[in-house]
């Protein structure tokens, strides 16, 4: 099984233009798309879900089109994320996320290194978008988030990727780092729906979101997969390119996600709706794991699914910021899990 870092490395093996699992971004960049008769392209029927994706009803009612227009309007004086740059990205200006009116895909393919309920037998249909609105100095995927590796695609090509992942039997469409390009995603989603997309949408985010955008995604997203990185605003300001309001906005956004989709729900061990929170253990408890665990139980409930991740590695500029210049010790990771247990979390791993 590939870890996320190895998955990224495999995807970037050809300068960010060949996606893992045989999905070639070079083909989409040239407009060819992926062959529907490619090996492994036979779909695993999605009708085994307990509920069909709610975005289908939004499209049928015309509400999804209204949400799409509202999100595109935000690009004209960009406030898609809490940084609220106010730049007119539709006129080609770059926001803090290093994105204008276009979008870049770094890689796409079935991913088997995500959490087990997201992977199932056929993988999570992962689409890595380039650039980021948070820009952590210890970013584990800095080639994508900071350096913008990948290919600029069209909405039709993105829709084609979604449909190809569905044909390959992926259990969800996993949108990685989607915050700064949500209008593009909704436009592509509507194109894909018209061609038969009916796979759950998974929103894989740093957590640095606004309530306005989260509410526009209500009913569009089936599974939320946010990070909650810090409990100390001063650390967020230091380590995430001046985002002292990270903790405030992320807490509010995650509570809204939980309101929308609730606790993670599964059929046959595969998630089809709900919230799963990621929390990366940092050296010397810089992530505030004890505070985080108590917050989850208090605000969301003890049954909330949480991944306490111990794989931190000092990457990108982390060595300039001790103690982020080292991995957490085994004792620190064990202590983090003890805090989760002591807080009363019942679904953490």
Q: Model segments located where?
A:
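N-terminal secretory signal peptides and thylakoid transit peptides that target proteins
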Residues: 1-16
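N-terminal [4Fe-4S]-dependent radical SAM core
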Residues: 48-78, 82-128, 143
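Conserved radical SAM core fold
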Residues: 145, 182, 207-210, 228-247, ...
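Generic structural signal for well-ordered alpha-helices
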Residues: 162, 186-189, 214, 254, ...
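Hydrophobic faces of well-ordered beta-strands that scaffold small-molecule active sites
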Residues: 173, 201-203, 224-226, 275-277, ...
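Non-cysteine beta-strand/loop elements that form the S-adenosyl-L-methionine
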Residues: 218-232, 305-311
């Amino acid at each position: 099984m590939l870890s996320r870092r190895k998955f990224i490395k495999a995807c970037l093996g050809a300068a960010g233009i060949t996606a893992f699992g045989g999905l070639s971004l070079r083909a989409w960049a040239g407009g060819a798309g992926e062959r529907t008769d490619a090996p492994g392209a036979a779909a695993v029927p999605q009708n085994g879900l307990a509920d069909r994706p709610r975005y289908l009803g939004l499209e049928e009612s015309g509400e999804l089109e209204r949400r799409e227009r509202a999100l595109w309007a935000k690009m004209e004086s960009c406030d898609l994320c809490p940084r609220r740059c106010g730049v007119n990205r539709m006129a080609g200006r770059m926001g803090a996320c290093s994105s204008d009116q276009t979008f870049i895909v770094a890689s796409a393919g079935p991913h088997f290194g995500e959490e087990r309920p997201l992977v199932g037998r056929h993988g999570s249909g992962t689409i890595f978008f380039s650039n980021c609105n948070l820009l952590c100095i210890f970013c584990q995927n800095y080639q994508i988030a900071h350096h913008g590796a990948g290919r600029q695609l069209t909405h039709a090509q993105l829709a084609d990727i979604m449909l190809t992942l569905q044909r390959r039997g992926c259990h969800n469409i996993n949108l990685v780092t989607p915050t700064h390009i949500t209008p593009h995603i909704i436009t592509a989603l509507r194109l894909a729906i018209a061609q038969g997309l009916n796979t759950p949408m998974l929103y894989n985010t740093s957590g640095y979101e606004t309530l306005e955008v989260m509410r526009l995604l209500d009913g569009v997203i089936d599974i939320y997969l946010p990070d909650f990185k810090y409990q100390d605003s001063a650390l967020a300001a230091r380590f995430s390119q001046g985002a002292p309001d990270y903790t405030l906005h992320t807490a509010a956004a995650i509570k809204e996600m939980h309101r929308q989709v609730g606790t993670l729900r599964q059929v046959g061990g595969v998630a089809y709706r709900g919230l799963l929170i990621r929390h990366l253990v940092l050296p010397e408890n810089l992530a505030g794991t004890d505070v985080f665990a108590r917050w989850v139980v208090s605000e969301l409930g003890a049954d909330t699914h949480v991944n306490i991740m111990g794989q931190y590695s000092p990457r990108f500029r982390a060595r300039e910021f001790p103690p982020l210049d080292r991995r957490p010790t085994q004792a620190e990771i064990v202590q983090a899990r003890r805090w989760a247990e002591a807080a009363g979390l019942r679904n953490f791993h």
